[in-house]
Swiss-Prot record:
Belongs to the ligand-gated ion channel (TC 1.A.9) family. Acetylcholine receptor (TC 1.A.9.1) subfamily. Beta-1/CHRNB1 sub-subfamily. Its main location: membrane. It is found in: Postsynaptic cell membrane; Cell membrane. Keywords: Cell membrane, Disulfide bond, Glycoprotein, Ion channel, Ion transport, Ligand-gated ion channel, Membrane, Phosphoprotein, Postsynaptic cell membrane, Receptor, Signal, Synapse, Transmembrane, Transmembrane helix, Transport. This is Acetylcholine receptor subunit beta. The lineage of its organism: Eukaryota, Metazoa, Chordata, Craniata, Vertebrata. One of its GO terms (cellular component) is synapse. InterPro entries: Neur_chan_lig-bd, Neur_chan_lig-bd_sf, Neur_channel, Neuro-gated_channel_TM_sf, Neuro_actylchol_rec, Neurotrans-gated_channel_TM, Neurotransmitter_ion_chnl_CS, Nicotinic_acetylcholine_rcpt. The modification Phosphotyrosine is found at residue 394. Residues 25-245 are extracellular. It comes from Bos taurus (Bovine).
């Protein structure tokens, strides 16, 4: 190799050793060797045996994934923010070329075993063991991400107009309060933060829930929930007070239920002769049953309370059931006749004469009451008629038109027969009718009686049909009132169920 090539190679080696990056890596390597010489990651970083290690616990919420009401489980994506001081990992930056922080793997340093106590899946670990940031003064900061499934007791009384108070309880699993003391997280200004932190730029909104309050609190239970008798373990509890967005249930459940209830109400507006009263009522009842079965998979299986939407569905189902029963009553009244039922006087007084005035019903007058009386027949006195004196007396003594064919008396139709018999026999038995005329009059009176009976039968049947129509209209207004009042009472109660203005009143 020529002398020039050797000179270039020597200059390259010297430049590599004198480069700033190389010096920095060597300085950091030497610092690591110095810090971890004799370091034990299983030993608590306390200067004295009785000293406590202060651990600050913060929580950054990245996403409220879901709240499973049936399993009473809340899923969240969070970042833990743990800060403590390890005096063994401190140095003077001036002695190490200005290095003021290091990134060290989590397996190499002591970590406070802070876990989620109320987890619902048995997973106590974080999602990723990221590096710990170590500052020159010995302060440690670890921000591992995690997807937690925590238990959340669901209050279903006002579902779907409800709000829930879900908690995430963190504590050191191995150390009690005499060894590790917890406190809530610190803000960038160094002040204690009393709530869950949410970064507005990266937070993912939930389509079903909105966060109302997110406070945190340090709790010192008097009894160790894990059964340890050595000492109390402090807990930091993060609260998420969330309110449900009810639009989905309003559109897909409540609005169809109200429409089905309207169908059940208008069953009573449908004429009984239409033949679809029972079909429409049963259709509404079956539809509500399907809605009830669909909601059964949404709410927790608890006997502590009944959700308000289930109350409304049951209320509607009871009304629809009664509409089916009352439709049977209306159809029974509609198809009654004088041959099968006799109308009591109180039924006639209430449902024909009194109630229609208050229900806006007006029965049309019979046509016979609107017809004018036919003109009376003038007496005949024709000597050539050939009928004789008895015939003349018959026409002279002919009674008014409603005597031979009296106006119907639906209560006492039998009274017309004696009057007609007295007319045929005549007031004076000395005055008689010819046999031919008596036979004609007898036939006419028989036809008149048959027509009268048929007319009375039709009138009484129309009375039953009118009673059925009055009862139908009475049920219509009754159901409108009950449905309106019941719906307002049920849902107005939910409007007053609001999250508290102060999370800790």
């Amino acid at each position: 190799m020529t002398p020039g090539a050797l000179l270039l190679l020597l200059l390259g080696v010297l430049g590599a050793h004198l480069a700033p990056g190389a010096r920095g890596s060597e300085a950091e390597g030497r610092l690591r060797e110095k810090l971890f010489s004799g370091y034990d990651s299983t030993v608590r970083p306390a200067r004295e045996v009785g000293d406590r290690v202060w651990v600050s616990i913060g929580l950054t919420l990245a996403q409220l994934i879901s709240l499973n009401e049936k399993d009473e489980e809340m899923s969240t994506k969070v970042y833990l923010d743990l800060e403590w001081t390890d005096y063994r990992l401190s140095w003077d930056p001036e002695e190490h070329e200005g290095i003021d922080s290091l990134r060290i793997s989590a397996e190499s340093v002591w970590l406070p075993d802070v876990v989620l106590l109320n987890n619902n899946d048995g997973n106590f670990d974080v999602a990723l063991d990221i590096n710990v940031v170590v500052s020159s003064d010995g302060s440690m900061r670890w921000q591992p991400p995690g997807i937690y499934r925590s238990s959340c007791s669901i209050q279903v009384t006002y579902f779907p107009f409800d709000w829930q108070n879900c908690t995430m309880v963190f504590s050191s699993y191995s150390y009690d309060s005499s060894e590790v003391s917890l406190q809530t997280g610190l803000s960038p200004e160094g002040q204690e933060r009393q709530e869950v932190y949410i970064h507005e730029g990266t937070f993912i909104e939930n389509g079903q829930w909105e966060i109302i309050h997110k406070p945190s609190r340090l709790i010192q239970p008097s009894v160790d929930p894990r059964g340890g008798g050595e000492g109390r373990r402090e807990e930091v509890t993060f609260y998420l007070i969330i309110r449900r967005k009810p639009l989905f249930y309003l559109v897909n459940v409540i609005a169809p239920c109200i429409l089905i209830t309207l169908l059940a109400i208008f069953v009573f507006y449908l004429p009984p002769d239409a033949g679809e009263k029972m079909g429409l009522s049963i259709f509404a009842l079956l539809t509500l049953t399907v809605f009830l079965l669909l909601l059964a998979d949404k709410v927790p299986e608890t006997s502590l309370s009944v959700p308000i939407i289930i109350k409304y569905l049951m209320f509607t189902m009871v009304l629809v059931t009664f509409s089916v029963i009352l439709s049977v009553v209306v159809l029974n009244l509609h198809h009654r006749s004088p041959h099968t039922h006799q109308m009591p006087l109180w039924v006639r007084q209430i449902f024909i004469h009194k109630l229609p005035l208050y229900l806006g019903l007006k029965r049309p007058k019979p046509e016979r009451d609107q017809m004018q009386e036919p003109p009376s027949i003038a007496p005949r006195d024709s000597p050539g008629s050939g009928w004789g004196r008895g015939t003349d007396e018959y026409f002279i003594r002919k009674p008014p038109n409603d005597f031979l064919f009296p106006k119907p008396n639906r209560f006492q139709p039998e009274l017309s027969a004696p009057d007609l018999r007295r007319f045929i026999d005549g007031p004076n038995r000395a005055v008689g009718l010819p046999p031919e005329l008596r036979e004609v009059v007898s036939s006419i009176s028989y036809i008149a009686r048959q027509l009268q009976e048929q007319e009375d039968h039709d009138v009484l049947k129309e009375d039953w049909q009118f009673v059925a129509m009055v009862v139908d209209r009475l049920f219509l207004w009754t159901f409108i009132i009950f449905t309106s009042v019941g719906t307002l009472v049920i849902f107005l109660d939910a409007t007053y169920h609001l999250p508290p203005a102060d999370p800790f009143p």
